[in-house]
From Swiss-Prot:
Gene3D superfamilies: HUPs. It catalyses: [thioredoxin]-disulfide + sulfite + adenosine 3',5'-bisphosphate + 2 H(+) = [thioredoxin]-dithiol + 3'-phosphoadenylyl sulfate. Disulfide bonds: none annotated. This is Phosphoadenosine 5'-phosphosulfate reductase. The active site is at C239. It is an enzyme of class 1 (oxidoreductase). It comes from the Bacteria. The keyword Oxidoreductase applies. The keyword Transmembrane helix does not apply. Keywords: Cytoplasm, Oxidoreductase. The gene is cysH. PANTHER family: PHOSPHOADENOSINE PHOSPHOSULFATE REDUCTASE (PTHR46509:SF1). Belongs to the PAPS reductase family. CysH subfamily. GO terms for biological process: hydrogen sulfide biosynthetic process; sulfate assimilation, phosphoadenylyl sulfate reduction by phosphoadenylyl-sulfate reductase (thioredoxin).
Length: 244
């Protein structure tokens, strides 16, 4: 696998970009998660960033990437509506793993947003998408631009939802390379990694949460529910960061 030219690939139509990356992805599928990170750092352009929602399994990708690339900027888009346990988890992991945390937020405070638009998350799919655009997408786009990112690592896994089931290890999103080192990991592999490295799940894992986002759009898992149904009232799985 050789070095890839981001500018040249960005000039191609989306379908052609996917095809151009197909051979590389076929080879990346044969590598371990650690090998994928090393390959990306050697063959993809910097600057490099890692995004995290500090969700249930966040410690895995944070530890994995940070141990290979210490001091990599870790982007958190903070909506202001995260669980208290999430903010505590952020502090704990930032200290334990010595993370170079970069927090980005919407230009409007949560209270100001509610005054202007009402509770967007109660306004169906359209309202949820507007909420996500304001609180997740715009701050992430700003982060990528301000940090001059050209390669973006994230901790998505195919097993998490139907919308992620066919994601490749390497893609181009928002004009930058996006690398998903643990995309093919199952829940057992996640558990084993956490145990091996003395890491914890998010505190709400023990209370029955399989996925954690904002307080108002996250539900505990109940028998018969798919993991993706615990977010956004089952109307959608993605918050907007990993779409497009």
């Amino acid at each position: 696998m050789s070095q890839l030219d981001l500018n040249a690939l960005n000039e191609l139509p989306k379908v052609d970009r996917v095809l151009a990356l197909a051979e590389t992805n076929a080879q990346l599928e044969t590598l371990t998660a650690e090998e994928r990170v090393v390959w990306a750092l050697e063959n993809l352009p910097g600057e490099y960033v890692l995004s995290s929602s500090f969700g249930i399994q966040a410690a895995v990708s944070l530890h994995l990437v940070n141990q290979i690339r210490p001091d990599i900027p870790v982007i958190l888009t903070d909506t202001g509506y995260l669980f208290p346990e999430t903010y505590q988890f952020i502090d704990e992991l930032t200290d334990k793993l010595k993370l170079n945390l970069k927090v980005y937020r919407a230009g409007e405070s949560p209270a100001w947003q509610e005054a202007r638009y009402g509770k967007l998350w109660e306004q169906g799919v359209e309202g949820i998408e507007k909420y996500n655009d304001i609180n997740k997408v715009e701050p992430m786009n700003r982060a990528l631009k301000e940090l001059n990112a050209q390669t973006w690592f994230a901790g998505l896994r195919r097993e998490q939802s139907g919308s992620r089931a066919h994601l490749p290890v390497l893609a181009i999103q928002r004009g930058v390379f996006k690398v998903l080192p643990i995309i093919d990991w199952d829940n057992r592999t996640v558990y084993q990694y956490l145990q091996k490295h003395g890491l914890k799940y998010h505190p709400l894992w023990d209370q029955g949460y399989l996925s954690v986002g904002d307080t108002h759009t996250t539900r505990k898992w109940e028998p018969g529910m798919a993991e993706e149904e615990t977010r956004f009232f089952g109307l959608k799985r993605e918050c907007g960061l990993h779409e497009g």
